[in-house]
Amino acid sequence: MKKFIIAIVMSLLFAILPFEVAAYNGEIVKFKMNDSKIYPGTQRNISVYVPKEYDGKTPACLWVSMSGGSFMLDTLDKLIADGEIPTIIGVFVSPGQIRDAEGNAVRYNRSNELDRMDGRYAEFLETEVLPAVCKRKTADGREIKISDRATDRAIYGNSSGGICAFNVAWQRPDLFSRVYTSCGTFVSFRGGDQYPALIRKCEPRPIRVFLQDNDQDSWNPLFGSWFEYNELVLSALKFAGYEVRHSWGKGGHSSKNARAIMPDVLRWLFEGWPELPKKGKSQSKTVASMLVEGEEWRCIGENISDGAMLHPHSEEKVVLQSGKQKEFVFANGSRTKAKGKIVLSDPYTALYPGGTHTAKRVEGSNWVWDYINTPDGKLSHGQQFYFLYADAGQILYDASGYLYVASKVGIQVCDQNGRVRTILSLPGGEVTTIAFAGNHLFAVSKGRLYVRKLLRSGTHNGLPKSEKQG
């Protein structure tokens, strides 16, 4: 038991190595962050590595680490000097703590920040950490400027930092495109064990991933085997067509092996730069049956008001309702004031093609109910039927009888038997409202209006072919 406790303590130390002095040619700029609005009350240290090659004028590439950084500095120095990787500014972020007046920690925020499955930490980096970094200057007066292109940005972490690195890029591929995760906590801490399934079901992101773990990695067996879950994540990434490599080392929950291969990992992560990592082609038959090759989401409107709703109208257009104002929106992005009598559908009720079923969303639930429509117009035999990964928002059917659900994780698409087959992701992540116009799907995400051409249509032409119970 004593050995087990010592092993746990040592593994945590490796996971959150402090930033200490090491041999390097660049400069370290340090500051404290105590004013976070996303993680209120937390205090943390930020260390910024600025290589001597950085000129203070051209925005540099970015390397973010949630797991220390002193061991990386000589590696970054050498690879940058040799031209094997671009000029990179390193930002090393410690986990937050809340301290009392005497300086004693009363809350450790590490797991809450790093193990979560939402986009909160990505938002923290985007809106709080990086703006604070860019307000600093080096000792010789160079301003710190960081590229905002995803292809120029990489992120690393060990243990909880490992799953955080992956989650940040997964949630916001517009921010980061290159990921190094070691001993990643893809276990049942805060939902990370869902990733092997989600990776398979979601449309691939344009990110490149290097996975490292050790064959005896099981920090606490209560939560599962770290190594086994990392193997499942690797399998899922390969299935979904990602640019992925891995290295399985000997040992337990430690960053030692990850640090040893850091130079080779960095070379591979930035191979082909500045080209963006390629978006993979998934082996999912559902994804193949839905997506038009080369077609992506197009932003056709901004500053969409909170509470705005989309409604189907015809093959050519949808209705965008913002309060009392109604507009027709077309796939080319044009918008005109809606005229005449406009009948708006209930966004939380959907009629199955052919009229045999009715689906109803229940607020605050990750289930959608299904009812059978009787000849006299009543709903019967209601059941919780469609199981979701996040609470349901607006719902609608396509012509094949698949249910589309707007949610915080994107647009969840369920088959006729109530199972999520795929999740369509938008740049903003959360989707609040959706509507079909023919084979164009419209969606609102983070105040922006998007449209995408699909191989599926929202036009119902009778009862679709049954998938039976398979």
Q: What is each model feature region?
A:
Residues 8, 67, 157, 183, ...:
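Residues that line or immediately flank small-molecule/substrate-binding pockets and catalytic motifs
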Residues 23-281:
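Non-catalytic cap/lid and distal C-terminal segments of serine-dependent acyl enzymes
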Residues 278-470:
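Sequence-structural signature of mature extracellular/luminal beta-sheet repeat domains
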Residues 17-23:
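Sec/Tat signal peptide C-region and signal peptidase I cleavage site
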